[in-house]
UniProtKB/Swiss-Prot annotation:
Cross-referenced Gene3D superfamilies: 2.30.30.790
PANTHER family reported for this sequence: LARGE RIBOSOMAL SUBUNIT PROTEIN BL19M, RIBOSOMAL PROTEIN L19
Gene Ontology CC annotations of this record: cytosolic large ribosomal subunit
Organism: Corynebacterium diphtheriae (strain ATCC 700971 / NCTC 13129 / Biotype gravis)
InterPro entries (alphabetical): Ribosomal_bL19, Ribosomal_bL19_CS, Ribosomal_bL19_sf, Translation_prot_SH3-like_sf
Keyword Repeat found: no
Family named by the database record: Belongs to the bacterial ribosomal protein bL19 family.
Family annotation (Pfam families): Ribosomal_L19
Function: This protein is located at the 30S-50S ribosomal subunit interface and may play a role in the structure and function of the aminoacyl-tRNA binding site.
Annotated gene: rplS
GO terms assigned for molecular function: structural constituent of ribosome
Key words of the record: Ribonucleoprotein, Ribosomal protein
Protein name: Large ribosomal subunit protein bL19
Swiss-Prot/TrEMBL GO biological process terms: translation
Keyword tRNA processing part of the UniProt annotation: no
């Protein structure tokens, strides 16, 4: 193992639950405002997961007051306090970009049994 691999292995988190595109997550994000920090929960559907190792990222989409909001997080960042899997989604794609064009109940994802 070379030096970069050792540094990457030291930065990996082991408290990340298994999740896939289509799952609904609660991501507890540390928000720092001035000298204070607080935890903010971002709840949405995983529409993408890409990369590997330290550089792995995932994108979550939610609709807030009628406006679609997408946020991309690195999986192994220290800014994420914890990730909770709320529901498992039953989808057949790895990238759920088609959800951007759907409105209302059409954008709903079936729950895995």
């Amino acid at each position: 193992m070379n030096l970069l691999d050792k540094v990457d292995a030291a930065s990996l988190r082991d408290d990340i639950p298994a999740f896939r595109p289509g799952d609904t997550l609660n991501v507890h994000v540390k928000v720092i405002e001035g000298s204070k920090s607080r935890i903010q929960v971002f709840k949405g559907v995983v529409i993408r997961r890409q990369g590997a190792g330290v550089r792995e990222t995932f994108t979550i989409r939610k609709v807030s007051f009628g406006i679609g909001v997408e946020r991309t997080f690195p999986v192994h960042t220290p800014n994420i306090d914890k990730i909770e899997v709320v529901t498992r989604g039953d989808v057949r794609r790895a990238k759920l970009y088609y959800l951007r064009d759907l409105r209302g109940k059409a954008a709903k994802i079936k729950e895995k049994r």
